[in-house]
Amino acid sequence: MIHADQLSKEFGRFQAVKNASFQIEKGEIVGFLGPNGAGKTTTLRMLTGYLPPTSGTATIAGFDIVKNPLEARKHLGYLPEHVPLYDDQRVTEYLKFRARLKGISSRQIWPAVSKVVEQCGLDPVRRKMIRTLSKGYRQRVGLADALLGEPDLLILDEPTNGLCLLY
């Protein structure tokens, strides 16, 4: 599913990630652990195609993240550390918009949105404007977005940030 070979990222003279190599197979659950500044978020951003590596290669479902980023992204859902949301949309409007961007067919959009709204506990806020949501609910909207389309791979950066324990 994911194959990284000697993945590195430099910012000027600072080396954020140095020669990271690993494989993650379908069905595996993996976490990156390390102190602040260890390169965890940078590695995730490279894997998702949001930040090009300085050197090395990585593939998702066999697609190179640099040469075929759109094909690679079709196989993943990504929840970044800081969730970029459109504050001037209602929760379900935003999720329908994101579903269209992900290529979900018109007749499947509402069932897909309904499913992730339920999975992420968003029903109480589904009609609210995103700008009015708490940090925890904003995080849930980001997770719902990542789950849209039932991706083969889910990449979560600080997924519990702002979430309250349920019961």
Name every feature range the model reports, one short phrase each:
Residues 143:
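Hydrophobic anchor residue at the start of the ABC signature
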Residues 154-158:
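Catalytic Walker B motif of ABC-type/P-loop ATPase nucleotide-binding domains
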Residues 35-39:
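Walker A (P-loop) phosphate-binding loop of ABC-type ATPase nucleotide-binding domains
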Residues 96, 100, 107-125:
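Conserved ABC ATPase "signature" region
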Residues 129-133:
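Conserved ABC ATPase signature
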Residues 56-67, 72-75:
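Conserved ABC transporter NBD signature motif
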Residues 148-152:
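A short, proline-enriched helix->beta-strand linker immediately N-terminal to the Walker B motif
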